C-alpha cells in the first residue's frame, strides 16, 4: 500500500471537515473510527493550517449539533494536530473544484502527496483523480485501513 508521492509505507489521507464533524456528533460511525485509527497510527492524517482552522470554526458553531463541551473539542483538535503530518501549502490550484471551499482540501492533498481524501462529498472532488488521489467516503476508507 502506497502512501502517496511522499511514500512513508503508510497511507496518508486528508480528512474533510464534514467527516470531522460527523466524528464529533457520533462515536458509533465510520468517521469516529477513522480518527481512532489515526490516533493508533493505522494511517497518517495530512493537515494544513487552513483545514485545522476550519475544523475549529465549524465545530464551534452552535447550530452544528455537537454536544461535546468546547474544551473537549479543543483537546481533540489539539490531538489531531499533534499526530498529523503538518503540510505547508506553497501553491494554490484555485479554482479547480465546483465548491471553492473544497479547493483547500484538494490543495492540501496535492501538497502532502496523499493517496486519499475522505469526505461525504465524493462527487465534488472529481478532479482529484488527475493528481492520483482517490476520493473515499468514510465507510470506504475505514474498510481500506482496517
Model-found features: residue ranges?
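Amphipathic coiled-coil/heptad-repeat helices and related helical stalk/stem segments
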Residues: 30-31, 73, 101-102
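Short, well-structured N-terminal submotif of metal-dependent ribonuclease cores
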Residues: 1-47
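Active-site neighborhoods of divalent-metal-dependent phosphate/nucleic-acid chemistry enzymes
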Residues: 82-122
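Short secondary-structure boundary segments
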Residues: 17, 49-50, 120-122
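PIN-domain endoribonuclease scaffold, especially VapC-family toxins
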Residues: 37-92
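Residues that scaffold the ATP/ADP-binding catalytic core of kinase and kinase-like folds
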Residues: 23-24, 58, 67, 128, ...
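Acidic, PIN/NYN-like endoribonuclease modules and their adjacent C-terminal/linker elements
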Residues: 2, 96, 110-116, 122-146
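Short, active-site-adjacent cap segments at secondary-structure transitions
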Residues: 20-21, 52-54, 124-126
Amino acid at each position: 500500500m502506497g502512501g502517496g508521492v511522499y511514500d512513508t509505507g503508510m497511507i496518508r489521507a486528508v480528512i474533510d471537515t464534514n467527516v470531522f464533524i460527523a466524528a464529533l456528533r457520533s462515536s458509533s460511525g465510520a468517521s469516529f473510527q477513522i480518527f481512532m485509527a489515526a490516533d493508533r497510527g493505522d494511517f497518517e492524517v495530512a493537515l494544513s493550517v487552513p483545514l485545522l482552522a476550519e475544523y475549529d470554526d465549524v465545530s464551534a458553531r452552535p447550530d452544528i449539533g455537537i454536544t461535546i463541551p468546547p474544551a473537549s473539542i479543543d483537546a481533540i483538535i489539539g490531538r489531531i494536530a499533534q499526530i498529523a503530518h503538518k503540510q505547508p501549502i506553497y501553491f494554490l490550484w484555485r479554482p479547480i473544484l465546483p465548491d471553492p471551499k473544497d479547493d483547500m482540501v484538494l490543495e492540501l492533498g496535492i501538497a502532502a502527496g496523499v493517496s486519499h481524501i475522505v469526505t461525504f462529498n465524493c462527487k465534488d472532488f472529481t478532479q482529484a483523480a488527475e493528481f492520483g488521489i482517490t476520493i473515499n467516503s468514510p465507510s470506504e476508507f475505514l474498510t481500506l485501513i482496517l
